[in-house]
Amino acid sequence: MTQKIIRVGNIEIANDKPFVLFGGMNVLESRDLAMKVCEEYVRVTEKLGIPYVFKASFDKANRSSVTSYRGPGMEEGLKIFEEIKRTFNVPVITDVHEPYQAEPVAKVCDIIQLPAFLSRQTDLVVAMAKTGVVINIKKAQFLAPQEMKHILAKCEEAGNDQLILCERGSSFGYNNLVVDMLGFGIMKQFEYPVFFDVTHALQMPGGRADSAGGRRAQVTDLAKAGMSQGLAGLFLEAHPDPDNAKCDGPCALRLDKLEPFLVQLKQLDDLVKSFPTVETA
């Protein structure tokens, strides 16, 4: 089965190539913190030889509570992304929530992300696709992996085949998510690169009444399980002080654990991709 290669600058993204890291923090809390977090990701990924794209959100539009922190907004957020790109010479990925945001965000960011909750919103999908920029499509918690073909088709119909699929878990009753490992193989059949968002797969949506809970202690186990499927990349959020993060701290990896965590993931990815394909159909 031929696997599509998506190129972002000098980075090649495909299911049969060494994994790429989309990593950073959940939401931009401040310019200084974003710079600190990116600096550590760059240090570790350069040391380990892992292709890297910085990730953060300028707005968290789907917070549980009306009083929850959402971010600095698009205008200020894009200024921070521009500085990060200049300072660290890394690509940037961020999410958009409304059609009007697609074009200005695409002028700054190398990859734009379609949020899971919004992945069936046709007007948003088409607006993003028409930018021509690479799109990371999050699989909604309520969609089966085979249903992702419809979102791919919307993008392709709008003229964009620079697409990535991203698994982030499926709803399992109330306040819980599970990851169906068989879903990775189903999505890989579409031939586009498939990523695993281990951070949000650890969420317990609404688990703390006014915000999401999480299972940070299990991040290594779940990441290894997902990456054992031979994926194009990993989506990861880290924070220097997760317990005081302004969003999704319970799911975030401690920043000082980033290097030992990625050492193991790279070794696993190298091993899995060294195996020949065994046809069992």
From Swiss-Prot:
Q: Which domain of life is it from?
A: Bacteria
Q: Enumerate the UniProt keywords alphabetically.
A: Cytoplasm, Lipopolysaccharide biosynthesis, Transferase
Q: What EC number(s) is this enzyme filed under?
A: 2.5.1.55
The record's catalysed reaction(s) read: D-arabinose 5-phosphate + phosphoenolpyruvate + H2O = 3-deoxy-alpha-D-manno-2-octulosonate-8-phosphate + phosphate
Where it sits in the cell: the answer is: Cytoplasm
**GO annotation, biological process:** keto-3-deoxy-D-manno-octulosonic acid biosynthetic process
Broad class of the protein's primary localization: cytoplasm
Q: Which InterPro entries does UniProt cross-reference here?
A: Aldolase_TIM, DAHP1/KDSA, KDO8P_synthase
User: Which GO molecular function, any one, fits this protein according to its record?
Assistant: 3-deoxy-8-phosphooctulonate synthase activity
Q: Which GO terms describe its cellular component?
A: cytoplasm
Q: In which pathway does it act?
A: Carbohydrate biosynthesis; 3-deoxy-D-manno-octulosonate biosynthesis; 3-deoxy-D-manno-octulosonate from D-ribulose 5-phosphate: step 2/3; Bacterial outer membrane biogenesis; lipopolysaccharide biosynthesis
The record's listing under NCBIfam families reads: KDO8P_synth, PRK05198.1, PRK12457.1
| Family in the record | Belongs to the KdsA family.
Record's protein name: 2-dehydro-3-deoxyphosphooctonate aldolase 1
Name the species this protein comes from.
Pseudomonas putida (strain ATCC 47054 / DSM 6125 / CFBP 8728 / NCIMB 11950 / KT2440)
What gene name is listed for this protein? kdsA1
